[in-house]
């Protein structure tokens, strides 16, 4: 199954956070929080403005983005957990 987001939605795969702190302490899975970063896998065509013109999204496939812990809707595709969310739910693009 392939997903093609509609309108101003994006599909994001969470990027797992480090399980060891800088000082070497290992964080167990049950104490670790959900990652709040991910990679954009697909983007919708955009959102229409009041004049009916299509406005493209600011993010693109491959961007690393920040989002809230509880943002988006989780879906399972080929054993992967992906998030479907609106572009407005994204906080920032992480520049390399």
Swiss-Prot record:
Q: Which keywords fit this entry according to its UniProt record?
A: Chaperone, Cytoplasm
Q: Which Pfam families would you find in this protein's record? A: Cpn10
State the superkingdom. Bacteria
GO MF annotation, one: ATP binding
- What S-S linkages are listed for this chain? none
Q: Does the keyword Isomerase apply?
A: no
**Keyword Chaperone part of the UniProt annotation:** yes
List, in alphabetical order, the GO biological process terms annotated in this UniProt record: chaperone cofactor-dependent protein refolding
Provide one Gene Ontology cellular component: cytoplasm
Where does it live in the cell?
A: Cytoplasm
The UniProt entry, under PANTHER family, shows:
10 KDA HEAT SHOCK PROTEIN (PTHR10772), CO-CHAPERONIN GROES (PTHR10772:SF58)
Biological function: Together with the chaperonin GroEL, plays an essential role in assisting protein folding. The GroEL-GroES system forms a nano-cage that allows encapsulation of the non-native substrate proteins and provides a physical environment optimized to promote and accelerate protein folding. GroES binds to the apical surface of the GroEL ring, thereby capping the opening of the GroEL channel.
Give the record's family classification.
Belongs to the GroES chaperonin family.
* Self-association and partners: Heptamer of 7 subunits arranged in a ring. Interacts with the chaperonin GroEL.
Protein name as catalogued: Co-chaperonin GroES
């Amino acid at each position: 199954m392939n997903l093609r987001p509609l309108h101003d939605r994006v599909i994001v795969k969470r990027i797992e956070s480090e399980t060891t702190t800088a000082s070497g302490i290992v964080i167990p899975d049950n104490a670790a929080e959900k990652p709040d970063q991910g990679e954009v896998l697909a983007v919708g065509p955009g959102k229409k403005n009041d004049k009916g013109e299509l406005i493209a999204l600011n993010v693109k496939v491959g961007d690393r983005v920040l989002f809230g812990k509880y943002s988006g809707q989780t879906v399972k595709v080929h054993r992967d957990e992906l998030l479907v969310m609106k572009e407005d739910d994204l906080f920032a693009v992480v520049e390399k």
